[in-house]
């Protein structure tokens, strides 16, 4: 039987294997969670058109702050002998202060944060401790949060006046700046984590290659974080272009070809596509489709349409890519509904 070595710190006993599991498995999970938060911060930034909505700034800074703080704490958990011993861990590990965490990290590495990276840490720390729950404080000036974010964006262009109307193309430069600096900061801490994990023979850095965390930490090895977000939007556009240009007769294309489309306002299509590429659905589009459904007097027809729509993008549906014989075309829709997984009726 394997002979476990016991480490005794602060009166607590912990097996060496348990510490290894904590650093390798638990911190690996934390790394993926951190990546999700950071990705959401960038994704939200890609979707904004200005700084007039406080809730959008809150989401950007909250998810960014939480994601980076988790990275800092992961690294400290790797360098500490027993990070689960509450009596011996540094105070900053159980608090929320990005600067104090960075000071502790600097005791274990010679790597240095960039000037912009340190500034962004300050914004996150300030937000997390002073603005995260500011709406619960009567009399708290909501404009201060906007000023906090602008104070960082001005490092890209200090002369820009955010209080004056600007073209979207002008604002894009600031979105790119924040996302790229966020990506650099995330990459900085990830590399510290990866190097330390390899040094102590843990697998903390091994993450799901199809996760958002991989897009944050791994894809940014060969492109900037902003470029990563742009290629994701371009991928959606390329798919839409392919579907529009290729009149196929197999797979999901046959279903799309057989269905009648609803009437749409061509002038609004580009706005709908913009929201789609940003990972959201246009509110006007939702209201319009809902209204058209309500106007469908034929309940059976409305039910059938919803059943067909339920097949599109449904991973449990396997489309036949073989050519259909002419005499099979009439039974196509009926055969598609033989699966017990597809629910019918107005519940869709």
What is the predicted role of each segment?
Residues 131, 144, 163-169, 348:
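Intrinsically disordered, low-complexity segments enriched in charged and polar residues
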């Amino acid at each position: 039987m394997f002979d476990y070595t016991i480490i005794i710190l602060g009166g607590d006993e912990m097996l060496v294997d348990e510490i290894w599991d904590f650093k390798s498995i638990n911190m690996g999970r934390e790394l993926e969670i951190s990546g999700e938060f950071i990705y959401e911060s960038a994704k939200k930034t890609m979707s904004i058109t200005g700084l007039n909505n406080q809730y959008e700034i809150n989401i950007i800074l909250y998810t960014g702050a939480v994601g980076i703080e988790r990275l800092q704490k992961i690294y400290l958990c790797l360098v500490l002998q027993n990070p689960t011993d509450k009596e011996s861990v540094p105070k900053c590990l159980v608090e929320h202060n990005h600067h104090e965490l960075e000071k502790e990290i600097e005791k274990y590495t010679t790597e240095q944060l960039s000037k912009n990276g340190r500034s962004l840490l300050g914004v996150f720390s300030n937000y997390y401790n002073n603005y995260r729950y500011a709406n619960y404080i009567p009399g708290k000036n909501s404009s201060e949060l906007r000023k906090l974010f602008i104070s960082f964006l001005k490092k890209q262009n200090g002369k820009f006046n955010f209080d004056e109307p600007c073209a979207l193309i002008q604002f894009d430069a600031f979105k790119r700046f924040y996302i790229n600096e966020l990506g650099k900061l995330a990459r900085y801490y990830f590399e510290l984590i990866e190097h330390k994990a390899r040094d102590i023979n843990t697998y903390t850095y091994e993450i799901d290659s199809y996760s958002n965390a991989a897009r944050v930490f791994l894809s940014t090895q060969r492109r900037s974080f902003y470029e990563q977000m742009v290629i994701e939007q371009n991928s959606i556009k390329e798919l839409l272009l392919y579907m529009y240009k290729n009149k196929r007769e197999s797979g999901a294309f046959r279903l799309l070809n057989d269905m009648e489309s609803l009437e749409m306002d061509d002038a609004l299509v580009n706005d709908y596509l913009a929201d789609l590429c940003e990972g959201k659905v246009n509110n006007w589009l939702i209201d319009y489709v809902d209204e058209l459904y309500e106007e469908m007097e034929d309940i059976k027809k409305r039910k059938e349409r919803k059943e067909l729509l339920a097949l599109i993008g449904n991973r449990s549906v396997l489309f036949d890519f073989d050519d259909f014989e002419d005499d099979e075309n009439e039974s196509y829709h009926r055969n598609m509904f033989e699966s017990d997984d597809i629910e019918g009726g107005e519940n869709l």
